Amino acid sequence: TQFYEHCPPFVTAESIRDDMCALPQRKMDEPQDKYYLGFFDDAEQLVAVMDFIDHYPTEQSCFIGFFMMERSVQGHGIGSRIITELCVYLHSLGYEYIRLGYVDGNKQSESFWKKNQFTDTGLRNHTQDYTVVVMNRML
C-alpha cells in the first residue's frame, strides 16, 4: 500500500504480528490499551483498519498509530465518516484530543488528516528511514 512506500519495510506476516504488539515506551506495561480496529461495510467486507492506543500521550487523549483504507473505497468519504464518528464518540467519553503522525512526504495522508481537522503540532519524530509529522485534533 501507499503507507509502505513512505514507511518501509514492506509488510510481512511477522511485521504485522510485531506491530500488533508495539507500544510506546511509556505504555509498555499497559498492553490492554492497544487496539486494532476493523471497519466493515454493509456486505461485511473489511474496508479499513486502525491501530489505536488509548490514553496516550496523556490520560485524556488517544493515538492513532495508522489508519488504512481499502483502495477500492478511497475517495468516497468513508474514511472521513469513520474518523468523524470516532471523534464524536471519544468526545462523548471526555477525551480532549487525538494525536497521530504521518510520514513526511506522504501527501495523501497529509491531505486526508488536514481535511479531517487535524493540525500540525510542529513536533517531528525522526527515524533512520523517515520523519514523522505529529498532528492533533482537539475534540
Task: Give the location of each predicted region.
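Acetyl-CoA-dependent GNAT
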Residues: T1-S72, I83-E85, Y89, L93, ...
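Active-site acidic-Proline motif in GNAT/NAT acetyltransferases
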Residues: E70-S72, H76, D104-G105
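Short coil/turn segments at alpha/beta junctions that flank glycine-rich nucleotide-binding fingerprints
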Residues: H76, L93-E96
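Residues forming the Rossmann-fold NAD(P)(H) cofactor-binding site
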Residues: S80
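Short hydrophobic clusters on alpha-helical segments that form packing/core surfaces
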Residues: L86-L90, I98, S109
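Conserved beta-strand-loop-alpha-helix junction that forms the acyl-donor binding cleft
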Residues: L100-E110, H126-T131
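Conserved acetyl-CoA-binding loop of GNAT-fold acetyltransferases
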Residues: K114-G122
